[in-house]
Amino acid sequence: ASDVYKRQNITRRVTQATAGDDVHGLVLLVQFSDKKFSSVGTQQAFDEMMNKEGYDYMGAIGSARDYFISQSGGLFQPTFDVVGPITLDNTMAYYGANDYSGQDVRPDEMVIDACKKAESMVDFTIYDRDNDGFVDLVYVIYAGYGESSDIDGSLEDAIWPHAWYIYQGAQKRVSVDGKYLDAYACSAELLGNSGTTRDGIGTFCHEYSHTLGLPDFYDTSGVTSNYGMGTWSLMDYGCYNGPDSDGDGYSDGSVPVGYTAYEREFCGWITIEELTTPSSVTLENLADSKKAYKIVSSDKDQYFTLENRQQTGWDRYMASAGLMIVKVDYDQSVWDYNTVNNESSRQRMTIMPADNKYSEYNEDGDLYPYNGNTSFTDDSRPAAKTNTGLKLGKPVTNIEQDNGVITFDFMGGIPAVVAPVADVATHVTTTGFPANW
């Protein structure tokens, strides 16, 4: 029953993704009895981070709202209502201490307690946009660092940024203003594990994207280290893209990578055109053209997407530019359980690197053309084969890049010829008429 319930929630979120500018997201600033926001953790600062056009803190190129407007081509224009700080009665460890399996013990209770305290300040009914009885989403930014930045065990009591459901966590129904709480996401105030630099928008955009239905594309098992999508996807390590503004040797997540073609189509923002017949293809930058292609195998759930990615805009901190080819091996249950790339022998959403090296340390060789590799065929390296060994039999050859424009031949590259369209005949006589086109 819980899995069905989860899919229903995801359906609601995807509907929200195409809601234009009629979306308000609730963001609660939450601090604990023993951990308060730093001096930079003010309501105004986070409101700007969420909503200010052209937000530029620590090298950012826009706010979270700017990011989603850009990725959706204006189809999704959320406004984030920032409330707080709200001080909870319990310590951070009460919510964030780890259980025997390494999971936070009560993060869902943090959300419940925060909403209860915010009830006098917030009209939760306006956040049930589809009027289904559930608050669409509660987002919490909590004081301090996230456990995901822990490198020495000092942050074990902190909360790990994540997206989840109240009912699945607390196993109970909780309501505010007559609306049930359920979908929530959370992330930390501060970047890294020291200093007072606010976290970039990347983590927020990543976690908020879960509420639009997208799963993680990194290995969520914590056991293996499969490559997945690396920094090429917001739903992997691309959420950390950006400059090293504080000089600690790490990017700060202030300029997260743009959505992939798959992610845009998943949210209903574009339609990826299938290549089926021989043609010579010209492909402009995805960020500008909203155009991408896919090549589908005999198993319709296994296919490859092709998109032109350039180092401009939100993609400016990518490792390289060119044609990005991504293998998709869709299984709804795997997506629902958020285990897309946990199986080493069957990663289901992963880049096909032009240099044939599946590693975050070689990402500058991932996009085509690279070092003489200008083809993606049944016999190329990497090969155009599905996870189950199906050969596409639909070669992509002669991949070139010129001035940010990608061209390639599909199945031999016969140019498309558009037949002339005849106009309606005029001056018709009993013996004939002049042809017009």
Locations of regions flagged by a protein language model:
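Pro/Thr/Ser/Gly-rich low-complexity, intrinsically disordered linker/stalk tracts
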Residues: 414-437
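Short, small-residue-biased leader/transition segments that mark boundaries at the very start
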Residues: 1-5
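Active-site recognition of the HExxH zinc-binding catalytic motif
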Residues: 140, 202-217, 306
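Acidic carboxylate motifs that coordinate Ca2+ or other divalent cations, activating on Asp/Glu
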Residues: 128, 132, 206, 248
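Fold-level signature of zinc-dependent metallopeptidase catalytic domains
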Residues: 7-51, 99-104, 144
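Active-site-proximal segments of metallohydrolase catalytic domains
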Residues: 9-17, 61-177
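Non-catalytic C-terminal accessory/binding modules of secreted extracellular proteins
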Residues: 38-89, 150-194, 264-415
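A domain-level signal for the mature, folded cores of soluble proteins
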Residues: 94-109, 113-116, 192-198, 211, ...
